[in-house]
Amino acid sequence: MSNIELLEKTLPAAPLKLIAMESCRELGQKVNDYIVSFRENTINEVSESSLYVNYKSNNYLVDCCCPRFGTGEAKGLLKETIRGTDLFIMTDVCNHNLTYTVNGHLNHMSPDDHFQDLKRIISAATGKAKRINVIMPFLYESRQHKRTKRESLDLSLIHISEPTRPISI
């Protein structure tokens, strides 16, 4: 049995949605195009069952943004529904090309700014999506795994998941 046959016999967990954060919009568009092409051309037969709702689509990308206020603070905003979806969020925390203004001054986004935006989008999606998965090429704040002095363990402070709705990072 080929891998495609296994894939054809596997039921989707939920309708697929993809969020490409501003730091990796181009990559997110390429992933979206590949998934659209794959689902249109490779999978031969999709059942008319309610389990396959929105299986084939022209676009899996979710329109979202993290607008900034004049002070540099931001908020996560989802511009379409993600209720009941299998949500994948893509981000690149090492992208230093993005900028925003604080009190009229141009500021480059740091890895911490990208990570905060990721947490804002996760917060906006929590309780609505069936599953939330994060695709992040560089696991930010993971370098420190034990304490040697009075110092923080930043990654260990992240408790995002609810018992019934896991979030994979």
Model segments located where?
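Glycine-rich anion/phosphate-binding loops
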Residues: V62-G72, N103-T126, T148-L157
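A short acidic, helix-capping loop that chelates divalent metal ions and anchors anionic groups
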Residues: N97-L98, S142-K146
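Active-site-proximal loop/turn and secondary-structure-junction residues that shape catalytic pockets
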Residues: F138-Y140
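Short N-terminal binding/cap micro-motifs at the start of the first secondary-structure element
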Residues: C24-V31
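Active-site-flanking structural segment that lines cofactor/substrate pockets
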Residues: E48-L98, F115-K119
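Single conserved hydrophobic/aromatic residue that forms the stacking wall/gate
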Residues: I158-I169
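Short hydrophobic beta-strand segments
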Residues: L11-E22, L87-M90
